[in-house]
Amino acid sequence: MKSPPSDYLKFWRVIRYYMKAKHGLGQADLDIILFLYSESYFGRKDFDRFAELVSWEVNRFVRLHQEGWIETFRKGRGPRSRALYQLSFKATRVVLDIYRKLNGDEIPTSLSSNPMFLKNVSYNDKVYRNMILEMNKYQKAKRTIARTAKKDDD
């Protein structure tokens, strides 16, 4: 069996935990945002269709809309015209940041950029913090190897 060119999912759990901690999102919220990212515009039925797969929360749509993760693209006017929504700039940035981290960008380790590096954090945050440091070290080594291989080819 041929292995993929890049091992994108190796640190998926660490990246997901970091994004949830940084942006105050739950697992279900993040899953829905990732699903809706490929949908340019969506209606409430589209949202509810995917929301059936994640943990149940009555007001999830309203909450995500109020918190600025979803914005109204077009208001519904009358019985035949339904409202359309789109992911906000904030939600789009989160998804793009996830892709960048999966492609090898390092997770920041400064106190101002990463809440898991504060002093008064949970044990879980400390465990993930150590894994972030390992992941960043791995990504640096991987980039160094790629650079030296490229120099050898030239």
Segments (PLM) and residue ranges:
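Short, amphipathic alpha-helical interaction segments positioned at domain boundaries
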Residues: F89-Y123
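Short amphipathic alpha-helical interaction segments
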Residues: E52-E67, R82
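Short, locally clustered residues in the helix-turn-helix/winged-helix DNA-binding domain
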Residues: L34-S38
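Short alpha-helical segments that sit at the start of domains
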Residues: K2-I32
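Short acidic, hydrophobic short linear motifs in intrinsically disordered regions
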Residues: E39-A51
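A short, conserved structural fragment
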Residues: H65-P79
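Terminal interaction helix/tail motif
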Residues: S112-R143, K150
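Short, cationic-aromatic polyanion-contact patches
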Residues: A21-G26, K75-Y99
